[in-house]
């Protein structure tokens, strides 16, 4: 008797022979029935049969809290008929670049003297888009207290996490921490970290429109901004999204040369 893959086993049968291991010897005159089949290999009892519940046992946990829902997980949920589940809403992330020297990459005019194109925002947006987060482009703020205050206000209004680049070092025009404390009554949890690149990375929290907001100030150097976005921004966004492993996998590696650490 022919059956399809995954179909129930006919009563009395105790083995399945794959069609590749058979040879059709005789059909009915109308070609609709297979009258005689040659089995090339002797089957064993239980061959190619899976017991009921062998894929997913009744009462088993198919997804743990903190699991990321991707294509495989959606298929698994569909298999068990789970059409509605509770999920954690991902945070909206506002990106704001700072610096008098920045020119928007969308500006098609020739690069102005003394300016550089703002590559950080494009890099961070692509990274966060790739991880499935909603991102708001809040433009570029100049090194001016009022302009930075206005742009930060807009970023806080539209996002749960505000990520800035530039303005966090020790220069006269590095104003982010000053504005956060004086204008937004923010709590600075750290303003320097023992790492390089990324030493001036800043983390602050504040309340805006009765909601708690997170601010991550990254260095303006593109390499530093990229490194710190992986070490701080992504884990922060994942933790707020309910990931059980916000930091991802840790891989040990051995470098083939000596590494001279910065004494600072």
Question: Model regions: which residues?
Answer:
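Short, glycine/charged-enriched hinge/interface segments at domain edges or termini
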Residues: 1-137
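Short glycine-rich anion-binding loops that position phosphate/pyrophosphate groups of nucleotides
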Residues: 7-8, 100-101, 167-173, 220
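Short acidic, glycine/serine/threonine-rich loops at helix termini
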Residues: 13-15, 74-75, 105-110, 148-150, ...
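Short acidic loop-to-helix transition motifs that present clustered carboxylates
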Residues: 46, 69, 140-148, 195-200
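Hydrophobic alpha-helical scaffolding
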Residues: 49, 67, 114-118, 138-141, ...
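Flexible glycine/proline-rich
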Residues: 56, 179, 183-264
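N-terminal small/polar loop signature for handling phosphorylated ligands or for N-terminal nucleophile
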Residues: 122-185
């Amino acid at each position: 008797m022919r059956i399809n893959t995954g179909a129930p086993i006919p009563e009395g049968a105790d083995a399945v022979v794959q069609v590749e291991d058979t040879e059709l010897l005789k059909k009915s005159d109308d070609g609709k029935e297979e009258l005689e089949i040659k089995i090339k290999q002797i089957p064993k009892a239980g061959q190619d049969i899976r017991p009921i519940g062998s894929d997913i046992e009744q009462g088993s946990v198919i997804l743990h809290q903190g699991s990321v829902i991707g294509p495989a997980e959606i298929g698994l949920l569909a298999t068990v008929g789970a059409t509605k589940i509770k999920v954690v809403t991902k945070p909206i992330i506002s990106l704001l670049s700072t610096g008098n020297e920045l020119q928007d990459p969308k500006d098609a005019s020739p690069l102005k003297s003394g300016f550089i194109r703002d590559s950080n925002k494009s890099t961070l947006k692509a990274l966060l888009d790739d991880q499935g987060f909603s991102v708001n482009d809040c433009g570029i703020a100049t090194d001016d207290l009022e302009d930075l205050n206005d742009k930060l206000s807009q970023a806080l209004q539209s996002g749960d996490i505000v990520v800035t680049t530039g303005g966090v070092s020790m220069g006269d025009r590095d104003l982010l921490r000053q504005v956060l404390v004086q204008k937004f009554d923010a709590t600075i949890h750290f303003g320097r970290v023992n790492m390089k690149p990324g030493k001036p990375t800043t983390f602050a929290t504040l309340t805006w429109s009765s909601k708690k907001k997170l601010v991550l100030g990254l260095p303006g150097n593109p390499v530093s901004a990229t490194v710190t976005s992986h070490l701080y921004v992504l884990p922060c966004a994942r933790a707020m999204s309910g990931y059980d492993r916000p930091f991802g996998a840790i891989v040990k590696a051995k470098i083939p040369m000596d590494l001279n650490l910065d004494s600072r």
